Amino acid sequence: MTRVIVAVLAAAVWLKGNLHTHTAASDGDSPPAEVAAWYRDRGYDFLVITDHDKITTIDAPQGLVLIAGEEVTDRLPKKPLHVNAIGLTKVVAPQKGTTPVEVLQRNIDAVRAAGGVPLVNHPNFGWAFGADELLQLRNFTLLEIASGHPYVNTQGPPSAESMWDVLLTKGRRVYGVAVDDSHHWKKPLGETDVALPGKAWVVVRAERDAKSIVAALERGDFYASTGVELEEVSATRVKVREKNGAHYRIQFIGDGGRVLQESEGTSASYTMRGNEGYVRVRVIDSNGRMAWGQPERVKR
């Protein structure tokens, strides 16, 4: 068993990818092949195209791993309720329901039944649901905590990141994801009301194939970013890759979103004391860009 684990880790590398992407096959403005090429040409290693209520299939450009995806697009009056399906094997139709919890749970379960990993999208989009509803959901491990889309109100209040902390404080195993939710490649870069690509992503430690990447997401072997790059990361240790003279603030966070330790610099570590509940790391640079490591439960 030890030899197998060592072999897997030896083959794993850091891979950058986007988990929430739209093309002209739904409400994006560019053909799927152009979208995939955009990400490949900018150094992304993998991409999940998540057009609304369909699986968009194209040939992968050389050097880019394409993972099957869909945004299951459900709603109640004035409440958009969306769940991404990552690595699924068949299209999932919106499952409907009478309450946000019922709708989301039915779609989460349907994604699982289709062989996919569910990602609960943008809770603050239309202020559709919050921490109370998330606490009632089961069978999911991924939550959008950062998004490049200008209309999904990620920062709240309350922020999607603070909802994540509520879940973690209650002992839930949930990992935080950053995504583009990209729709627009043909808009001027100066426009602020468009969903442009390249704003947020995840970096996964995995082998360079779809199955390995999806498994790494499911077990939380990744970090999320809106621009900060990390060389090393765990719940209690981080090393930042310096860029463009930026300065970095490193925070270790525990129960209730409380900052346990804070420092300036490009590396830091934290020693668990046993009363934190969980520990996760967040890095903020002097331009406001961020990176989030995944949490570790503290054994009392």
Question: Predicted segments — roles?
Answer:
Residues L9-N139, E144-W164, V179-K186, S286, ...:
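A metal-dependent hydrolase metal-coordination microenvironment
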Residues M1-R3, V8-L9, K170-Y175, D180-R300:
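C-terminal functional module detector
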